[in-house]
Amino acid sequence: MRKTAALLLNLGSPDSTKVTDVRKYLDEFLSDERVLDVNPVLRKLLLKLVILPRRPKESAEAYSEVWTDEGSPLIVTSKKQHNLVSNQVETSVYLGMRYGSPSTAEVVQQIIDDGVTDLFIMPLYPHYAMSSYETAVVKTMEEINTRKPEMKTSLLQPFYKDDDYIQALVDSAMPHMEDDDDLLLFSYHGIPERHIRKSDPSHAHCLARPDCCVNPNPCHATCYKHQCLETTRSFIEKSGIPEEKTAISFQSRLLRDPWLGPYTDFELKRFGEEGIKKIKVMCPAFVSDCLETIEEIGMTGVEQFQETGGESLSLVPCMNDHPSWINFLVNRINQWEKSLTE
């Protein structure tokens, strides 16, 4: 007998702001070969000798700035999304995290124990990147194939320019815009340039020439940069915001390798130096507010902008539990269930 279910997947969070919990989380996160994609021996050395001795304390302090009485903002919001979606669909809905708790392995085992035969895997990443969308899918399929390889699975593809996703972005963001804003900055999570090249199936197109993201190419199906540009273009088109009052940047770089640019922190300082006074910043790569939006942009970003002359930087909240975003997820689940009977 068929039993269907959907699995919402997000990144994850430490269990608390304690340095020990943050260290455990960072160790798991940065041990992922699709995140820190270097030689395994070098990765271990970097973690043990460079990153884990100092970064957990710094990150714990940052997490303490955003932690709520309910816990991690990402986990709290993800649970709200899960509950809202569950209440609007007939199928069972589960929530899992790539790192931390509830772990992918735990949730997959629960899905199996509950007798699910058909699973709709829904990575909550609009854009394809090996360090987010890809690793979430690979980890989930590894757990399924190890435990119940006969389970039938379907996958929500990156939805970076899906009209309903763009509409949800517009619906959630536009109420925060003001007529006297000088600029709307789209700040996407950054990734190393080598990740773009590794995700290019041709190994010859992405970042090989200036127009690589403009001219249509099959490589765009797995090109994070192209997909971020498309989200921005689609948002501008649907919202009606003048393109000349927008900009794009990439945040959260780690280590010294070249990452996608321009870098958000550099851009915020430049905007202040150039006399731009009032900006809004939205982060479309994130569907839920988290450390990278609340602290990195809403706190540190404000300081970076103001220290060079900027006056007002406001973080535009992510879609979080906005009805249009919840409707997007509900509709995708319903469409999937309908496809099973066709």
Label each region the model flagged:
Residues 1-342:
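Active-site-proximal alpha-helix that buttresses catalytic centers in soluble enzyme cores
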